[in-house]
Amino acid sequence: HPSLLPAFPGADAHSDVLSSQVRVSGCTVHVVDSGMDSGTILGQSRVPVFTGDSRASLAKRVQIEEHRLYPEIIDLICSGHEVVLDD
């Protein structure tokens, strides 16, 4: 998910981040459950939000971290490590 859950769940996280004027965003790998982005968090990575960021520039920065974090979490799970950050 393209935000640091539980902040900014839903389909347009980047726009929500920008309109809130927070200085840090990021991405979350989580278990999918029946709620809205409410599953157990398995990993997160932070990125800065810069003054003047557009939705596209923030999305690109977050996507780079998503592409780094997702395989890292998969590797940890496949090697038998506990990766749950919350319950």
Predicted regions and their residues:
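Donor/substrate-binding cores of folate-linked one-carbon enzymes
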Residues: 2-85
